Amino acid sequence: MNDLKDLLDARLFLLDMDGTLYLGDDVFPGAVDFIHTLADTGRQYIYLTNNSSRAGTDYITRLRRLGFPCEAENVFTSGMATALYLNQHYAGKPVYLVGTQAFRRELLSYGIPLVDDGAEIVVAGFDTELVYEKLDKAVHFLRRGATFIAANPDWVCPMPAGEVLPDCGSICALLTAASGVQPTYIGKPNRNMVDVISAQTGVPNAQICCVGDRLYTDIAVAVNAGAQSVLVMSGETDEAILKASDVQPKYVLRDVAELAQILRGGTAV
C-alpha cells in the first residue's frame, strides 16, 4: 500500500453510497461506524452520488432510515450538480427532462424551467420511471438542435444478488444512437463535482478524498480533480477489473471498515 500520509491528512471525504456503504437496503458491516469515525476524528464528509433518480432530500431520508447520520449539508448528488450547471451555463433555457419525478422536483427547486414543447436542452438522468414517450420526445428535440446534458455516465446501477438496473449511461446510449447527439456528462468522473464542493467548503482538492467502488466514476473523478482516492472492493470492482484498468486508485482497501481502522490509527489488515 502507498504511504498513508496523504490519506491521513485528508480533511473531507466524498463518499459513494451504492456498493460502498450499502447495497440496496443491506448496510455493509462497519459502514455506520465508519461515518462516526470520520466525525469523531474531526473529518468532514459528504455523501456523493451519481444516482440522479432521487432528490437530495430523498437521500437524507434514506440514509437516516438505514442508520447513517445525515444533514442537508452532507448530501450532494449528480442531479444537484446538473441543476447548478444549467443555471451557470444555460440560465432560463427551456429543458425537457428524461428523469424521475424526484429529479424533476430537484431541478424545479433550482428554478430550472421544464417544458414538454419547445425544449432547447434535453436533460437525461437515471430514469426508473422511463416510458417510450419520453425517449420519443427527447430524440425529437435532439434531432432539431437541442443541447444534450446528462446527469451521470453510469451504465448500470448495482442491485443485491448481482443484479443491475440500466442507468443513465445506458439510456443516453439509446438516445445517442437514435439522434446522433452525444451528451455532456455532469456527474462523476467530471471534476466539477469535486471543484464545486471544494469551493463551498474551502477544503483544497488535495485534502479531499473520494471513496468508492467504481473505477470509471468514483476513482476517475479524484484523478481528474487532483484529489486522493480510495477504492473499496465491496462493490463493482474485482481484482481482474482493477488490474486491467487505466484508472488506478491511490489506495485499495477491502471496505470502509478497514478505512475506519486506518483513520483511527490502527493497522490495516
Where are these regions (language model features)?
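Asp-based, Mg2+/Mn2+-dependent phosphohydrolase catalytic module
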Residues: 1-15, 22-43, 54-76, 83-269
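Domain-scale selection of a single, long terminal region
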Residues: 46-48
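Conserved phosphate/oxyanion-binding catalytic-loop motifs
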Residues: 51
